[in-house]
Amino acid sequence: TLASGQLSLGAAGFMSVGAYVGAILSLKADLPIVVGIIIGGLVASLVAVIIGLPTTRLKGLYLAIATLGFGEVVRVIFLNLDITNGALGLSGIPSIPQELTNYAYEFDLDGLMGIDAVAWGNLMAIIILLAILVLIIACCVRINNSRVGRAFAAIKADDHAAELMGINVVYYKMMAFIIGAFIAGIGGGLYAHITNFI
């Protein structure tokens, strides 16, 4: 969102949405980890649409305060829901490193090159996380070098001038807000499935 000149402090709220949705889908609905994480990112994006409609018209400190308030509201909601186990949190979330360790045992990688299966699982988890990071960076670079990125830069420089040039400021601010929420939701889902507890 900062690419379009918006200071949003709601990333923790969107990360929470992604983490809880991904964890609940993996725990309660027995969905694969990847599916739960992606759905968590999509739900965070949907929440961004709902929150973004009124808040993207705000600027500066007012937007920062509104999005910070959203993060606190999300925290209080998740601490008081039965499905999230309240203040006790969710434990036993399927772990990405553990799943990869199971695959290492299944494919008989235990002891290969002097590395045990647990280390293989952790190594593969790190490689997957780095690949996701590279993919997100590549997407952000691609967006910045596109027509959308130029619109973001124009809005960041002067949103009134950008609007006079025919750029739909609210549309592009919403787009930046939704993209940021999706990335935060994916990050939250990954966090939940790495730490096994939220």
Summary of predicted features, one role per range:
Residues 1-198:
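Transmembrane alpha-helices and adjacent helix-loop boundaries
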